[in-house]
């Protein structure tokens, strides 16, 4: 089992730098997830930078994390179609990073919200 962490990253992938990864290692974790709010914002140079930082510390590439809200089951067809585009973009980013998986939530039709 690989023990990674999410809570030591102050934001999305843009905030991951050497200091963040060193802090993760000092706490005894072996990697840190990569949160991606906008998969279109990650360019090839960003992929190279992230992979280099992880590789230089012996961190395996972790899972990526996309939308927590998730609209795959939204009642509005256009909302669902946009979410499907997002999922496809996340799959592409995860593949480019060499990530073993991406974590996404399908959503909820619960009127009180998906967390209740």
Residue ranges of predicted features:
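N-terminal pre-domain/capping segments
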Residues: 1-100
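Active-site groove signature of glycoside hydrolases
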Residues: 94-115
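Surface-exposed cleft-lining segments at the edges of enzyme active sites
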Residues: 75-78, 112-116
């Amino acid at each position: 089992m690989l023990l990674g962490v999410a809570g030591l990253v102050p934001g999305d992938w843009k905030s991951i730098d050497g200091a963040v990864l060193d802090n993760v290692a000092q706490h005894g974790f072996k990697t840190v997830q990569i949160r991606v709010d906008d998969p279109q914002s990650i360019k090839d140079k960003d992929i190279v930078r992230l992979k280099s930082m992880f590789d230089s510390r012996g961190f395996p590439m972790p899972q990526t994390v996309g939308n927590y809200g998730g609209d795959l089951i939204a009642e509005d067809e256009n909302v669902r179609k946009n979410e499907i585009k997002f999922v496809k973009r996340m799959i592409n980013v995860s593949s480019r990073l060499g990530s073993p998986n991406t974590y996404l939530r399908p959503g909820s039709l619960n009127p009180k919200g998906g967390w209740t």
